[in-house]
Amino acid sequence: MADDAVTRNRKSMDDLDFTGWNNTDWEGVFARHHTDDVVVEVHGQPPTHGIQDHIDAMKAFVESTGGTPIQVSSHPIAFGSGEWTCVVGDLEGAGRMVTVAKWTDGAIAEEYVWI
């Protein structure tokens, strides 16, 4: 049963990155895959508390990199255990990123990102 949750959460991470992030669908797909009280730590940035704080920080990050998000083209490495997942994302022309996420009821409650 736990493996089913990991599989669902990994698919949700694909949707989050490939649809929500790549298309800047902040209030739709992006928000849907996070809890309202999500805590996110992006390496080198202050942590955010709550989905709106996280969205605002990601909008600012995208603006600081030219106004278009660096596209996540694939997750060549993805695994999980219990309520946790880890994905390595290929970024078009920019290397890789890593996201470790703790899931609660199908949404990210804690997230750690290295870009």
Question: Model-predicted segments: where are they?
Answer:
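C-terminal and inter-domain tail/linker signature
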Residues: 1-115
